[in-house]
Amino acid sequence: MASLSKPSLPSYLCFLLLLLHVSSSYGGQFRVIGPSHPIQALVGDAAELPCRISPGKNATGMEVGWYRSPFSRVVHLYRNGKDQDGEQAPEYRGRTELLKDDIGEGKVTLKIRNVRFPDEGGFTCFFRDHSYQEEAAMQLKVEDPFYWVSPGVLVLLAVLPVLFLQITVGLVFLYLQHRLRGKLRAEIENLHRTFDPHFLRVPCWKITLFVIVPVLGPLVALIICYNWLHRRLAGQFLEELRNPF
């Protein structure tokens, strides 16, 4: 009787194995694994947030989704084999896509197009199989390719082309001016070689008189002749008035 009432060692082992099986079936069917480091994306580009279950198994019939706090805003939801676009938050409608090529192995990726600064922060991925659900958190870091450029640098970048153009025009002008001066200097030297040095030492008033007299001489002679002719005709006209017959 004593031997029958005392539990045997194999009975204990069977009981422990049964507990482990039940706990593995209901307490830990799978776990969700996300990226261990923040996902980086540039403004305007696309970001991909991977998520998977372990151990891997077919997740086609599961409910898969991403949401954000606060208020558990739905970023993307997959249920009954279809994307539930109507349940998305307004800011993500038309911008997300669930990549399901490896969903048979329990691997999916959420693609967010046209990334914006408000997209930066935490996302939560979840897998739900009937009443069992597991989830994993991940971070998205959004960067601007010009984040390092201060307003002063932007102003400098805008002014530099104009300044460069002005400097270029100024250098071209100085070059042309120097070339023109050299040409004029050469022409003046040629004139010095052409003219007699003795002529160049003549006083200026003599040169002026030498140039003006040939021009004004005929003009003065013409004026004198005109006055003489005018007086002669006037005298004849007066004489005819005195002796009409």
Swiss-Prot record:
Domain of life, source organism: Eukaryota
Compartment annotation: Membrane
Gene Ontology process terms (BP): cell adhesion; regulation of cytokine production; T cell receptor signaling pathway
SMART domains: IG, IGv
Signal peptide: 1-27
Pfam families documented for this protein: V-set
Disulfide bonds: C51-C125
Topology with respect to the bilayer: Multi-pass membrane protein
Transmembrane feature ranges: 153-173, 209-229
InterPro entries in UniProt: Ig-like_dom (IPR007110), Ig-like_dom_sf (IPR036179), Ig-like_fold (IPR013783), Ig_sub (IPR003599), Ig_V-set (IPR013106), IgSF_BTN/MOG (IPR050504), Myelin-oligodendrocyte_glycop (IPR016663)
Gene3D superfamilies linked: Immunoglobulins (2.60.40.10)
Domain Ig-like V-type: 29-143
Record topological domains on the Extracellular side: 28-152, 230-245
GO molecular function, one term: signaling receptor binding
Positions annotated as glycosylated: N58
Annotated GO CC locations: external side of plasma membrane
Keyword annotations: Cell adhesion, Disulfide bond, Glycoprotein, Immunoglobulin domain, Membrane, Signal, Transmembrane, Transmembrane helix
Cytoplasmic membrane side: 174-208
Family in the record: Belongs to the immunoglobulin superfamily. BTN/MOG family.
Role summary: Minor component of the myelin sheath. May be involved in completion and/or maintenance of the myelin sheath and in cell-cell communication. Mediates homophilic cell-cell adhesion.
Subunit structure: Homodimer.
PANTHER family (alphabetical): BUTYROPHILIN, MYELIN-OLIGODENDROCYTE GLYCOPROTEIN
Protein name in the entry: Myelin-oligodendrocyte glycoprotein
Gene assigned in the entry: MOG
